[in-house]
Amino acid sequence: MPKFTLDGKEISFEAGETVMEAAWREGIEIPHYCWHPGLSIAANCRMCLVHVESGRQMAMPQLAFDEAKGEYVPSTKPKLQPACQLAAAEDMVVSSTNDEVKTAQASVQEFLLLNHPVDCPICDQAGECKLQDYYYEHQGTLKRKLTEPVHKPKGVRFGPTIVYDAERCIMCTRCIRVCDEVAKDHVLDMRERGNKNEIVLAPGRELDHKYTLMTEHVCPVGALTSQDFRFKARVWFLKSAQGVCTGCATGCNTHVDYDPRNGKIYRLRPRDNAEVNQFWMCDDGMMTYTRHDTDRLLMPTVGRGEERVPVGEEAALELAAEQLNAVDASKLAIVLSAQHSTEDNLALAKLAAALGADGLYLAALGEWEGDDILRSDDHNPNRAGATQAVSGTVLKSVPDLLANVQSGAVQGVLALGWATAETLEELAPLVTLDGVVSLTSHVGALPAAASVTIPVADTFEVDGSFVNAKGLTQGFQATLSPPAGIEPAWKTISDLAGKLGKDLGFKDLQGLRQGLVDAAEAAQ
């Protein structure tokens, strides 16, 4: 590959790459505001100006003092060029740190801060604001303007998710380009010129497409804030874990930001993955974290309706085993979950095999509104993983299960997860059975129909993996610890197997995952 030199280091580049792109790929940051690897080049912030010492120089006219003549004479010098727009060339020598570049960066910073409000103590971007970071790195001086700063609109609600502060805006146009190029909706633009510039909505429109939170995500300052995260947490108190979105079968990669002091998740952010979601997520995916602590099942229960009472886990497991043992294996339905990890589903499939139960079903949410950007028509994150767990066996649907209950072909049910497309009224046939055991993290129609419910850990509380619509297996990390006494579903299934007198052949997650390798090989 051809190479150029940046600040004394050789950088390989591909044909058509800019200096910025090649440096970014190598993990080298050239200061910038408007450039983003997933968006078109705007080159309007001028923070990424670099000095081309040899190669594709641009000449800038100047007056230079000629000592021999004792006067200023016309001359030229290399012009600083934006790295985001400068095409890399073989043997080019570039500096992003010499004195001339540093002076230019300090000037850009001073210019941007002339009218910028000192909102840092109340700004949600504080702690991850490039304007703050670059001030300390590239300016560090007081502004020289002593007059009243220009005032612009503040707290403007662009739509149901985003609030705009024009005084903080540096006009990088990232938000405009996200709407145009990612969401394919030209709903934002800018008006006026100079220090009167501001971002505006298209006439008669709101910022209400499916990717509005990406405008806040790409904003390098605090001009765009999310109504969900606004004023809720300081980012320096948050830790981050690697997750996978549970919103649909695309499986967008996420950063899960949480506060370890109170065990609360505050937001999701897209995690770059060129094969899956690139740099983006949809709004619904960004908000899936809100389900974590909503309608949680925290205690095992037995009985139905008004007779449902909480019990200890040991008592619940023993009663569940008693009810399942009372059903002939040929009439026992095992319901896997398209919401749970592949590991959880594999553990349940192993239990089904140990019991000799071949009636396998899948509980899944119904379809939602997909698109040709990121959103899959399949509302479930792991339909493919559940199928992989049973080595490609065709899983029947919940309506099939209900029909078999009504015909008498099914007389007992062991179900994983809470999510189905059906309501409790539609699941009424299950209430006629004496033995319906539900392993679930949340309440829902399926757990409500059960005779025994046993709480299990939520996705944010376990290590696991999903298989997305493209067949790509993606792992995720436990973000939080589950509530006291609650275990991952695969562990609870193993404990239930023990009560049923069955050995599933694994003792820990690593041993279970070896079964995934075996299942994948069997499916080929």
Where are these regions (language model features)?
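Short, structural beta-strand-to-alpha-helix junction motif
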Residues: 4, 18-21, 341, 488
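Phosphate/diphosphate-binding loops
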Residues: 62-64, 68, 209-270, 417-420, ...
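Cofactor-/ligand-binding subdomain signature composed of acidic, glycine-rich
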Residues: 146, 154, 259-330, 374-380, ...
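Conserved short loop/turn motifs at secondary-structure junctions
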Residues: 10, 33-38, 165-168, 200-206, ...
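A basic, amphipathic helix-loop patch mediating RNA/tRNA/ribosome contacts
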Residues: 19-53
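Fe-S ferredoxin-like electron-transfer domains
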Residues: 46-246, 250-254
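Short beta-alpha connecting loops at secondary-structure transitions
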Residues: 3-5, 90-96, 199-204, 240, ...
